[in-house]
């Protein structure tokens, strides 16, 4: 193990659900479009034609990864914008048809906040609970649909607990009721197989920096037929991206997303096998040497690179400080600066101490076996030390049932 430690660079990055390093191949593909710049919408000269050709190739590559047509993909600044455009765009365009939207309590904050905004505009939103394993109950979804429901938004893969929702079945339910179905696929695109036709998806949000492309670029798939989806744009201007998203498409960033999609299509299957093996090693090593470790979210219906664990009798923030040579998260990267427990874990209806002691490990393309073994050893030794300092741990060791204790308020 000492030799393995010397082979790794510290700190070890295990936060791949928050972001990913831009792949060197992606960066290489982008560089010419920084140097030989032009506006892809300038169609009166060869500079513009070249830029446009590069953007359209990128669009085709993104579309290919989800079995869509290139014309059904528009470029955005990222998944947050895509989610906002999908939800608000459908709601505003079809508001005369209905004013009811269904989503899930464990969605990304940009989906939840888009829905809350629409509530101030007179829309009614149903926020569905999930089961204890993080998966949506389809019967609950069915029973929530009304004749005013126009949109259902359910994320494909959860950013905190990594669970994969039964998207194809959800899409089928939506289409049987004539309802549009949107899915936030920021954590799924390039990680699992996606077929928008087979999965009955009408709108799908994509993030570049989650799949080894740069920050600042994303995409939105918008179904063109059976049914055709129409949106009210949020950004008005030159009418780029089929009038859905005005503004000059950043050629280098679009090229980067396209190249990342091409690479993902090539390596996804093999990469998932390797990443899943690393995740299993991490989980098994921790479980083998530590008692009272709780897995958050379903283990089987989960992307390969996610592991979310709670370590009772210690606080998540103290764990983070104790393992400062590991870059991990105690919640969603968008909200982990807050000391409030994760709303995703709260939605699982687990004990409060488990909410506060959770750590999310994100494993990705550049994670090595040596890093995983180092991480497991550091986690085990750190949790043991923290528990030794915890009076609650001492009581548990003595056989005291903490649930039966009545604490006096001071």
Swiss-Prot record:
Residues with PTM N6-(pyridoxal phosphate)lysine: 210
Main localization, broad class: cytoplasm
Pathway note: Cofactor biosynthesis; iron-sulfur cluster biosynthesis
GO cellular component: L-cysteine desulfurase complex
UniProt keyword annotation of Metal-binding present: yes
Superkingdom classification of source: Bacteria
PROSITE patterns, per the entry: AA_TRANSFER_CLASS_5 (PS00595)
Matching InterPro entries: Aminotrans_V_dom (IPR000192), Aminotrans_V_PyrdxlP_BS (IPR020578), Cys_deSase_IscS (IPR010240), Cysteine_dSase (IPR016454), PyrdxlP-dep_Trfase (IPR015424), PyrdxlP-dep_Trfase_major (IPR015421), PyrdxlP-dep_Trfase_small (IPR015422)
GO biological process: [2Fe-2S] cluster assembly
Annotated disulfide bonds: none
Catalytic activity: (sulfur carrier)-H + L-cysteine = (sulfur carrier)-SH + L-alanine
SUPFAM superfamilies: PLP-dependent transferases
Cofactor(s) this protein cannot do without: pyridoxal 5'-phosphate
HAMAP family tied to this protein: Cys_desulf_IscS
Assembly notes: Homodimer. Forms a heterotetramer with IscU, interacts with other sulfur acceptors.
Family according to the record: Belongs to the class-V pyridoxal-phosphate-dependent aminotransferase family. NifS/IscS subfamily.
Protein name: Cysteine desulfurase IscS
Gene: iscS
């Amino acid at each position: 193990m000492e030799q393995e430690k010397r082979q790794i660079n510290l700190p070890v990055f295990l936060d791949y659900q928050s972001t990913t390093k831009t792949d060197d191949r992606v960066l290489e593909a982008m560089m010419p479009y920084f140097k030989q710049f032009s506006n892809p919408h300038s169609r009166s000269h060869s500079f513009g034609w070249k830029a446009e050709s590069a953007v359209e190739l990128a669009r085709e590559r993104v579309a290919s990864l989800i079995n869509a047509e290139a014309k059904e993909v528009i470029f955005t600044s990222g998944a947050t914008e895509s989610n906002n455009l999908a939800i608000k765009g459908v709601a505003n365009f079809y508001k005369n048809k209905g004013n009811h939207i269904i989503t899930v309590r464990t969605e990304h904050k940009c989906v939840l906040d888009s829905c809350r905004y629409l509530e101030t505009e007179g829309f009614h939103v149903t926020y569905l609970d999930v089961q204890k394993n993080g998966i949506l109950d389809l019967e609950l979804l069915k029973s929530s649909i009304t004749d005013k429901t126009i949109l259902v938004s359910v994320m494909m893969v959860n950013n905190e607990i990594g669970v994969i929702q039964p998207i194809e079945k959800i899409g089928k339910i939506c289409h049987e009721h004539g309802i549009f179905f949107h899915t936030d696929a920021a954590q799924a695109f390039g990680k699992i197989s996606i077929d928008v036709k087979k999965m009955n998806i009408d709108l799908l949000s994509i993030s570049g920096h989650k799949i080894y492309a740069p920050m600042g670029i994303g995409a939105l798939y918008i179904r063109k037929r059976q049914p055709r989806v129409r949106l009210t744009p949020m950004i008005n201007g030159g009418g780029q991206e089929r009038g859905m998203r005005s503004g000059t498409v950043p050629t280098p960033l679009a090229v980067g997303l396209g190249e990342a999609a091409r690479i993902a299509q090539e390596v996804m299957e093999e990469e998932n096998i390797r990443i899943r093996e690393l995740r299993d090693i991490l989980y098994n090593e921790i479980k083998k040497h530590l008692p009272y470790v709780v897995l958050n979210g379903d283990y089987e219906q989960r992307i390969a690179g996610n592991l979310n664990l709670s370590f009772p009798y210690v606080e998540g923030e103290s764990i983070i400080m104790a393992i400062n040579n590991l870059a991990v998260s105690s919640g969603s990267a968008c909200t982990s600066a807050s000391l409030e427990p994760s709303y995703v874990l709260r939605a699982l209806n687990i004990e409060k101490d488990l909410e506060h002691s959770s750590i999310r490990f994100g494993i990705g393309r550049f994670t090595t076996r040596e890093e995983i073994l180092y991480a497991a050893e550091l986690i085990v030794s750190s949790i043991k030390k923290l528990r030794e300092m915890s009076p609650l741990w001492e009581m548990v060791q003595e056989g005291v049932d903490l649930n039966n204790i009545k604490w006096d308020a001071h």
